[in-house]
């Protein structure tokens, strides 16, 4: 978390209190890339749900099997967009991705939002009625939270 979320200064700022002459730690960079890849995979999962994939039991409380209803597809589309934005926000914290090559205030706020989102995702995936969703979603969200707070 120290490098992915908390710091606002650019990696090339000589006053940046980090190792390697101010660059983000290598393990934080790897964690950011892993978080981004996981969020892109989650976004692809939600995009597949929007397109009619029969994975309704794995999402949204596992209320239905097969393809999602129209309202569920709208929720999946929103989740898809949110996942892509969060992946890009985490990449921006290490100076990569489409949100800019330098960390910005927006990227910092979005990175904090991503951490809060991950905490909520862990809780919701642990308390869901769907055993399939709990078996898939809980470990993925726990890994995401662990990597985000790395």
Describe each region flagged by the PLM:
Residues 1-19:
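Short, intrinsically disordered terminal tails adjacent to the first/last structured region
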Residues 27-37, 86-94:
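Hydrophobic, membrane-facing alpha-helical anchors
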Residues 90-124:
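Mid-chain, well-packed structural core segment of small domains
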Residues 120-137:
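Membrane-helix boundary connector in multi-pass membrane proteins
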């Amino acid at each position: 978390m120290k490098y992915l979320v908390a710091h606002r200064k650019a990696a090339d700022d000589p006053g940046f209190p980090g190792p390697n002459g101010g660059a983000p730690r290598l393990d934080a960079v790897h964690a950011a890339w892993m978080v981004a890849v996981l969020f892109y995979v989650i976004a692809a999962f939600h995009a597949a749900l929007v397109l009619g994939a029969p994975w309704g039991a794995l999402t949204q409380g596992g209320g239905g099997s097969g393809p999602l209803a129209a309202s569920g597809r709208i929720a999946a589309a929103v989740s898809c967009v949110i996942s892509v934005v969060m992946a890009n926000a985490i990449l921006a914290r290490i100076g990569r991705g489409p949100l800019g090559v330098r960390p910005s205030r927006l990227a910092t706020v979005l990175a904090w939002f991503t951490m809060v989102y991950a905490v909520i995702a862990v809780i919701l995936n642990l308390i869901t009625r769907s055993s399939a969703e709990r078996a898939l979603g809980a470990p993925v969200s726990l890994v995401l939270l662990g990597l985000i707070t790395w």
